[in-house]
Structures are given as C-alpha cells and as structure tokens.
Amino acid sequence: MGSIDSTNVAMSNSPVGEFKPLEAEEFRKQAHRMVDFIADYYKNVETYPVLSEVEPGYLRKRIPETAPYLPEPLDDIMKDIQKDIIPGMTNWMSPNFYAFFPATVSSAAFLGEMLSTALNSVGFTWVSSPAATELEMIVMDWLAQILKLPKSFMFSGTGGGVIQNTTSESILCTIIAARERALEKLGPDSIGKLVCYGSDQTHTMFPKTCKLAGIYPNNIRLIPTTVETDFGISPQVLRKMVEDDVAAGYVPLFLCATLGTTSTTATDPVDSLSEIANEFGIWIHVDAAYAGSACICPEFRHYLDGIERVDSLSLSPHKWLLAYLDCTCLWVKQPHLLLRALTTNPEYLKNKQSDLDKVVDFKNWQIATGRKFRSLKLWLILRSYGVVNLQSHIRSDVAMGKMFEEWVRSDSRFEIVVPRNFSLVCFRLKPDVSSLHVEEVNKKLLDMLNSTGRVYMTHTIVGGIYMLRLAVGSSLTEEHHVRRVWDLIQKLTDDLLKEA
C-alpha cells in the first residue's frame, strides 16, 4: 500500500505534465530542425574524416550509464548528436568513401522513407495495408520490366516479387523453398543428402544461409575459381562436381550464381550455369545485389542472358539505385513454391480476402511477419528520376571507375589485378617497386591512405593476391573527388617508396 501511495505522490509532483508522444505542430517544428541538421550534414560531410577516428568504447565514456527519468529538450539532444555521435560515424555518405560497396541515397528515397515511417503501416496481409501490398506488386513489376525480365518473374505474368531487407534473407527464403520442394519428393530423412553450390567468391552469407536452412555444413560446395575465368564459376568445374555428387548418392539442390562479387565484381556465366542447373533439377538463384542494377542499362543487360532458365533473382537498390538501406528485391518464377515453404495462417490474421485466395499476403513471402511500407521509396525514385536518370547515374559511376583504371595503368608502379567490369577497380603496387614484400608494401599504402581521413578504401585477397579496392558509387562522388584520391595515392606512394 505504501509503495502505491509513493508512486501517486511522485506522479502528482511530476513536472512533466500531460504526455503526448505525437502532437502535429510540435512534430512539424522538430522535424524542420532535424531536416536542417541532415541537410547540413550532407552539405558538410566532406569536412569530416571519412573513417571514424574514435577508439573502441569511446561512447560509453560520454553517455550516462542510465536513461533519463525526466525528458530532455531536443536542443540538448541535437548538441550531443553533433558532439558525441557524429565523431563516431564512419561517413558512408562521404564522396570520398570508396570502401566495400557504397550505400546510395537520394532525396526521393529519403522522402519515401519519411512517408513510410509516418504511415507506420505493417503490411503482413493485404487487408492490413492494401496500398502497401499493391504498390509493392506494381513497383516490382516496373523494375522487372526495366531489367527486361521475362513475364515469368512478374505478377502480370506467372511469377512475382517481394522487397526483402537484405540479400541474405532473399537467399535463405529461396533455399528453404528449394529444400521443401526436394523433401516433398524424397522424404524428410533425406535432408542429409541435399547439396548447395556457390563459389569461393560467393558472398560470405551463402554458407550461413545454407546452415540456417538445415543444409549440412559438409554439403556446402564452394567451387574454386581461377584467374583464367576472371574468378567466375567455371561451368565445366560445376558439371564435374555435380556429377560426382550424384554418383556418390547426393542430391544437388541449389546453386547461387553471382553478378558482381563483393571482392572484385566477378560475374558468373548465368547462361551456361542455368543450363546445367536445369539439366540436374537444381534451383538456381542469381545474386545480383550489386551489379544487377547496372543491367537497367542496355550495355550491361547481357550479364542476365539465360535469366529465363533461372528460378529466382535478387538485387539490392540500396547499393546502386539510390535507395536507402534496406531494400533488396527478390523475384521468383514459381511463387507457389515460396508460399508452400513459408506460409503461416494463425487465427488472429485470418480474413475473408486471404481465405478466398484473392490477394497477396507478403508475410508468406519472407521469414518475418511484420514489414514496412518498403515500396514507397522505390516508387518515388522511379517516378522522380525516371529510368533515364538512373541509367545516367550508373554510367557516370562506371565512367569514373574507368577513368581511375586508366590512371592506374598509366603509372608503371601499379597494376590492375583483375578486370574492371563496373565501377570497382582492384589494383596494387607491383612486386618489384619496393624491397618490402609486395603484400606488406600494399598494406602500408592502404593504412597510410585511410589514416589521412581524406579517403576510406578496403582490400581483398583473391587468388592469393592482396589488392586494394576502390569502389566508385557514393551518391555525392564527382570526377574531381576521384581525381583527388588518385593524386593522394600517388603522393603517398612517393613517400612510401622513399622510406622503403
């Protein structure tokens, strides 16, 4: 009784007053303040170090150990964001960010994210958000048309598509669908016979998703690639591996082909691989997370040759089509296989439209039940910019990558290690330019570059060769930025070789 009285007293003496978590005019005022902050951040992002200079654990020293009991004014919070959060950011928005693959952004996508957040709908079934469901179906068909995918991947045909969070989720869903199709024929005890194929260049999430789908770790085949195939999968090697597995009593289940590997943007020959997959009844998925976006340009569309024989395809507009994270598009040729594997139908979600099988319920196309109104930002991007400007954006990045490649080739101290397919350039200092071991001297150069704060690049090792990666693609990058990073590379190389 005493504790209840104390609470009542505390509440009656509270200075907070009536609590309204959302009040239109106050939101308008605060949102204007936040938009100004964001616009200023984008405007000035080049003045910040690209790679954060803080030490691990820095933030715990600056943030109180407990949450505030009483509310704090937005002005104080904004000051702390500038003082404590921004210094700890590796600035992916910087025009001098060339690491990994840049996460692209745009005004249209930001507005779409704002609207999606504001509406806050949860579109797990059609009835829970009809507009969210139907716009996603339309946008997925739009993008499929732009990519010149066959009708078998569209809702207007016999297939369909869904916007997932990431490529990992897309591949997990398709492996599960392939697994269920196989086990319906073979029986559940045969799961130990199922084999999945990728390459040693396939994204690291592939073995993880296979394991999550119940594939035995020893049954995950990562096909070795070589410089002779530009680190793409050799159809001959794949065929031999599949034939050996069949002879040993295994069941080939799933093949993940990649358009634009993370290390070097290597491309697997979809046309040839799909023929082998179809011959052996293997579900073939094309992971085009990065390079698939380039296929909206006619000059790159040939990378999708053979797509009519593929079972599923995914690409991530957040990598190159100006959409904020997260946004991955997954198309499947036979949606019923996905639905058979992933459908749930609890009593509390049942409704007349779903029961009559008249609508799409996207909860049955993904792992989770809940989902955002993800299609809004893609809809705004496509309408605000049109295909022509998206193609121009892709071509501009590729042109800057080609320009950087030419500068590298013109300097006799450097070499291009693997062919440039898109806007990523993989290069290194040659073995004979320094008394240091070739890997050591290239590591030193990368460390020197990143320590300046003026650029952020990463490395990879392919075929036993350590190389530097420069990935053009930030939404803010222009030709003069690429020119400046090359000037910086040359200057630091001069300094490094003098020391060596």
UniProtKB/Swiss-Prot annotation:
<dbReference type="GO" id="GO:0030170">
    <property type="term" value="F:pyridoxal phosphate binding"/>
</dbReference>
<feature type="binding site">
    <location>
        <position position="203"/>
    </location>
    <ligand>
        <name>L-tryptophan</name>
    </ligand>
</feature>
<keyword id="KW-0210">Decarboxylase</keyword>
<dbReference type="GO" id="GO:0036469">
    <property type="term" value="F:L-tryptophan decarboxylase activity"/>
</dbReference>
<dbReference type="GO" id="GO:0019752">
    <property type="term" value="P:carboxylic acid metabolic process"/>
</dbReference>
<feature type="binding site">
    <location>
        <position position="168"/>
    </location>
    <ligand>
        <name>pyridoxal 5'-phosphate</name>
    </ligand>
</feature>
<dbReference type="GO" id="GO:0036467">
    <property type="term" value="F:5-hydroxy-L-tryptophan decarboxylase activity"/>
</dbReference>
<dbReference type="InterPro" id="IPR015424">
    <property type="entry name" value="PyrdxlP-dep_Trfase"/>
</dbReference>
<protein>
    <recommendedName>
        <fullName>Aromatic-L-amino-acid decarboxylase</fullName>
        <ecNumber>4.1.1.28</ecNumber>
    </recommendedName>
</protein>
<feature type="binding site">
    <location>
        <position position="262"/>
    </location>
    <ligand>
        <name>pyridoxal 5'-phosphate</name>
    </ligand>
</feature>
<dbReference type="Pfam" id="PF00282">
    <property type="entry name" value="Pyridoxal_deC"/>
</dbReference>
<dbReference type="InterPro" id="IPR002129">
    <property type="entry name" value="PyrdxlP-dep_de-COase"/>
</dbReference>
<dbReference type="InterPro" id="IPR015421">
    <property type="entry name" value="PyrdxlP-dep_Trfase_major"/>
</dbReference>
<feature type="binding site">
    <location>
        <position position="318"/>
    </location>
    <ligand>
        <name>L-tryptophan</name>
    </ligand>
</feature>
<dbReference type="InterPro" id="IPR021115">
    <property type="entry name" value="Pyridoxal-P_BS"/>
</dbReference>
<feature type="binding site">
    <location>
        <position position="348"/>
    </location>
    <ligand>
        <name>L-tryptophan</name>
    </ligand>
</feature>
<comment type="function">
    <text>Catalyzes the decarboxylation of L-tryptophan to tryptamine and L-5-hydroxytryptophan to serotonin, respectively.</text>
</comment>
<keyword id="KW-0456">Lyase</keyword>
<keyword id="KW-0663">Pyridoxal phosphate</keyword>
<comment type="subunit">
    <text>Homodimer.</text>
</comment>
<feature type="binding site">
    <location>
        <position position="102"/>
    </location>
    <ligand>
        <name>L-tryptophan</name>
    </ligand>
</feature>
<dbReference type="InterPro" id="IPR015422">
    <property type="entry name" value="PyrdxlP-dep_Trfase_small"/>
</dbReference>
<feature type="modified residue" description="N6-(pyridoxal phosphate)lysine">
    <location>
        <position position="319"/>
    </location>
</feature>
<dbReference type="GO" id="GO:0006520">
    <property type="term" value="P:amino acid metabolic process"/>
</dbReference>
<dbReference type="InterPro" id="IPR010977">
    <property type="entry name" value="Aromatic_deC"/>
</dbReference>
<comment type="similarity">
    <text>Belongs to the group II decarboxylase family.</text>
</comment>
<dbReference type="GO" id="GO:0005737">
    <property type="term" value="C:cytoplasm"/>
</dbReference>
